[in-house]
Amino acid sequence: MTLLVIRHASPSAPRPQLPAQLSGHRVLCSDCASLSEVRQCLCQPQARSADWVLLDVGVADEAQWQAEGGALQAALERLPAQYIELQSPSEPGLDARLRLQHGPAAVVVDQRSRQAGYPLSLAIVGRRLAQEG
């Protein structure tokens, strides 16, 4: 059983501190340089078999949203796992941009930074995994 963190960030951005395991489940992280790569990660077998996905779409320019929004929406709608969206306080969330039918189990917004939202996101997933057994 796996928790997959999909993170859209520049290669120079520091990686969040993630545990190797959470409630006995492996934690894997995929770093993506664009929304196109985020979409590709969501379509990979690794994401399709994950128990939970923590999705950090980061900041993308309007051109990326125009080019990838529809495909990203389709990938999220097909995602079998529940997911948590880590949202930047200064950016609209996925639901506002994509009008999702399969919305996140939770949206975490920390006013300090997206990085600061990781501990709460992991705690939510950890609790849900512990409840699921």
Segments and roles (model prediction):
Residues 60-97:
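Mid-chain, well-packed structural core segment of small domains
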Residues 6-7, 56, 85:
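Short beta-strand segments
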Residues 35-46, 68-75:
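A short, acidic, amphipathic alpha-helical segment used as a generic capping/interface helix at domain edges
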Residues 6-21, 28, 92-133:
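Short, glycine-/small-residue-rich phosphate/pyrophosphate-handling segment
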Residues 27-29, 53, 83:
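Hydrophobic beta-strand scaffold residues
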Residues 1-4:
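Extreme N-terminal starter segment of soluble prokaryotic enzymes
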Residues 41-62:
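Short, glycine-/small-residue-enriched flexible loop/hinge segments at domain edges that mediate gating
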Residues 25-38:
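A short beta-strand-loop structural module common to alpha/beta enzyme folds
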